């Protein structure tokens, strides 16, 4: 470990410069979810449970956005290592056409059949009626979010990681203000409840897109070739499909798996309380993981650029070892801090703030302790799968490692304990986390094999 961590000051300074803005961007994004949850929770447990259930299909949209964003990032980071700006424009063009088409299809489905989709998420029909207006609107926000996320990924891949932080910081302030006005009907605006939360999100996503468009027209770091972007060509389409479609499938089915975990909680005997607790604790857990997501994204940029520059296998393996150990140590520190805060903040601050009491409060504590304890495992798997393996073009293995533990272990085990055996919530929450225990050792084995290193910019058969 100590040998792997022996790097000069310039290396760690560069890592921090990449990681910090991405971590802050994720913190802002997840804080937005927490603010939404906080405001909706003031309406009552039923409203919060309804939005949680509505966000199950929405999470699939988020996964599609992240999949396209991550997939195009694989190509752009390696093209950036070669300083091939025209190919970067082509990659952005392909991702934009395909990404918007996918997001639009899902948004239309959510708009046309919101109640029917909500009925699949929970066995409480009154929650479906509460969540349907939210679902009708929220899907279209991700059409705009798709375009802005692709541009943020491009900026991040060319080492301008602060762009996303600034963009999402702006949109979070706008979203929070519009939430307050539209959810509660302040300053002459109508009181729209959960539908107001969706409209506020849509408006903030439109604002993100407008800012990205203005920046794209003025950027000097990656001056876009608009002709190449509008007509990216068949070769780039094939390359994008080869290296990015597995990532998209990965994120789509991983998002579906996470959504099914929420569906399972929504069909337990204590579904309303479980959904309310999960809404709060899921957001808190993600807040503690923002640094890990930042390190994972920084790993992808550094590894992808190193491959594009033509660094040797020995240099790439040394880089991956260093980044892996850094992520693990950060995960351990975060887990210790998070667990220490449970007895200090939950009872006096978190529970009153989100109006959790009785069974909901007990379930929230259970989900928090198990989730926080597993942070080091999540940290390493994030760095390995979304960072090293994806940036190395090892998309088949990164997809298999992300999906197999979830679908073959976590989902069946959670369904068995939660729906069939009605087991204690402690065991159900541990089952939700089970995938990370299996994923980590297999990731370690794959990276040590050195078979993950591929130059995705080379012609077919030369990678």
Label each region the model flagged.
Residues 7-38, 42-43, 59-71, 75, ...:
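N-terminal transmembrane alpha-helices
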Residues 27-49, 118-125, 181-192, 252-283, ...:
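Helix-terminus/linker motif at the lipid-water interface of multi-pass membrane proteins
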Residues 48-108, 145-164, 275-343, 379-398:
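Small-residue-rich hydrophobic transmembrane alpha-helices
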Residues 60-63, 175-179, 209-213, 286-290, ...:
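Hydrophobic transmembrane alpha-helices of multi-pass small-molecule transporters
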Residues 69, 138-156, 164-172, 197-212, ...:
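Short runs within selected transmembrane alpha-helices of multi-pass transporters and secretion channels
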Residues 17-33, 137, 148, 171, ...:
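Transmembrane helical elements of multi-pass membrane transporters/channels
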Residues 1-22, 76-141, 189-245, 303-374, ...:
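Short alpha-helical transmembrane segments in multi-pass integral membrane proteins
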Residues 24, 28, 32, 61-65, ...:
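Residue-level hotspots within pore-lining transmembrane alpha-helices
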């Amino acid at each position: 470990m100590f040998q792997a961590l022996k790097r000069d000051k310039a290396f760690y300074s560069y890592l921090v410069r990449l990681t910090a803005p991405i971590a802050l961007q994720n913190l802002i994004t997840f804080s937005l979810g927490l603010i939404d949850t906080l405001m909706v929770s003031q309406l009552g447990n039923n409203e919060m449970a309804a939005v949680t259930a509505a966000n199950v299909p929405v999470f699939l949209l988020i996964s599609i956005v992240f999949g396209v964003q991550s997939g195009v990032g694989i190509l752009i980071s390696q093209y950036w290592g070669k300083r091939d700006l025209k190919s970067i424009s082509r990659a952005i063009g392909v991702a934009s056409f395909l990404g918007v088409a996918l997001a639009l299809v899902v948004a239309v489905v959510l708009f046309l059949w919101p109640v029917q989709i909500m009925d699949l998420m929970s066995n409480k029909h009154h929650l479906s009626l509460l969540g349907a207006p939210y679902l009708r609107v929220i899907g279209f926000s991700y059409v705009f979010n798709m375009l802005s996320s692709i541009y943020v990924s491009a900026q991040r891949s060319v080492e301008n990681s602060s762009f996303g932080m600034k963009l999402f910081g702006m949109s979070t302030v706008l979203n929070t203000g519009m939430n307050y006005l539209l959810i509660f009907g302040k300053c002459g605006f109508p009181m729209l409840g959960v539908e107001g939360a969706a409209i506020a999100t849509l408006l903030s996503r439109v604002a993100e897109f407008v800012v990205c468009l203005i920046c794209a027209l003025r950027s000097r770091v990656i001056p876009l070739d608009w002709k190449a972007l509008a007509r990216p060509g068949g070769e780039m389409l094939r390359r994008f499909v080869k290296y990015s479609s597995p990532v998209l499938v990965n994120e789509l089915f991983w998002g579906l798996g996470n959504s099914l975990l929420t569906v399972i909680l929504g069909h337990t005997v204590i579904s309303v309380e479980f959904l309310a607790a999960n809404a709060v604790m899921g957001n808190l857990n993600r807040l503690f993981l923002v640094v890990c997501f930042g390190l994972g994204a920084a790993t992808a940029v550094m590894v992808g650029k190193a491959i594009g520059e033509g660094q040797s296998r020995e240099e790439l393996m040394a880089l991956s070892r260093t980044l892996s150990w850094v992520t693990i140590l950060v995960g351990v520190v975060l887990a210790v801090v998070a667990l220490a805060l449970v007895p200090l903040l939950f009872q006096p601050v978190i529970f009153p703030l989100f109006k959790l009491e009785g069974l909901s409060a007990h379930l929230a504590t259970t989900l928090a302790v198990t989730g926080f304890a597993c942070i080091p495992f999540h940290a390493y798997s994030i760095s390995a799968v979304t960072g090293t393996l994806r940036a190395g073009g090892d998309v088949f293995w990164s997809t298999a490692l992300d999906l197999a533990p979830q679908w073959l272990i976590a989902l069946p085990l959670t369904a068995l304990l939660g729906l069939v055996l009605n087991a204690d919530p402690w065991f159900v929450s541990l089952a939700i986390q089970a995938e990370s225990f299996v994923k980590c050792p297999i990731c370690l084995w794959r990276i040590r094999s050195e078979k993950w290193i591929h130059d995705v910019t080379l012609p077919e058969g030369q990678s």
